[in-house]
Amino acid sequence: MNIPQPAVALARRQLHFIWLIDCSGSMTVNGKIQAVNSAINETLPEMLKVAAANPEVQVMVRAVTFASGAQWHVSQSTPLEDFRWQPVSASGVTDMGRAFRLVADYLGTVSGRNLPPVLVLMSDGAATDDVSGGLQALLNEPWGKKAVRLSVAIGDDADLDMLQKFMSYPEMPPLRAGNPEQLVQQIKWASTAALGASSKLSHNSGNPQMPPLPMPPPPDPGNAGSWVF
């Protein structure tokens, strides 16, 4: 007699996705922070498409804001399909290093079975705290070092040197946005490309290498730095 076997649901591997968002006072100029809010809202449906193509992966989303200090804007990791963006506002200085340390502490609690995290940093200026120490703390964490890290320079005053150091692809410069439309394009590309790259490792869990990004180039920034509406 054939005895039916119980169905066994395969455990989905988690992929932790974190936006790190500059909310300093300069982000109020010409509506930059409003453009960030719009960009993330427009990016979420595209991220859902990437996730749908990788059903064995559970994408968990959080966000960190940094200004005078750093804090979790999204307090708990939330499944992408349940995630709703709450707008951020801007004021204060640029404590980017504290944001790196906050993320480092969190990644230290993430299970080793998961996929490489995705970290997308966006900033329009130079840090006002110990950003080098914060970045080193992030890279000292195994998941911080293995993360797919991309950065977006907003306007012409962003610290391109630090944004380059944050990137996990040294041959690739930070993405640049000189107006709201470009910012939407760059955040959308960075978020979906990085998410897709890390998700593909679910098919080859033994591969320790940094996942390659897809080849479609990020949008041409054109008037980078002008921030013209």
What role is predicted for each listed range?
Residues A51-A52, G112, L139-A147:
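Arginine/glycine-rich "motif VI" loop of SF2 helicases in the C-terminal RecA-like domain
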Residues D156-N207:
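Von Willebrand factor A/integrin I-like adhesion domains
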Residues G155, P180, L201-F229:
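Extended acidic, low-complexity intrinsically disordered regions
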Residues L10-I21, M60-T78:
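Short coil-to-beta-strand
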Residues L20-S24, V36, A63, V103, ...:
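DG-centered beta-turn motif at the end of beta-strands
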Residues M1-I18, C23-Q34, T109, L115:
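Acidic, polar low-complexity linker/tail segments
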Residues G25-Q58:
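…and closely analogous acidic/polar surface helices at protein-protein or active-site interfaces
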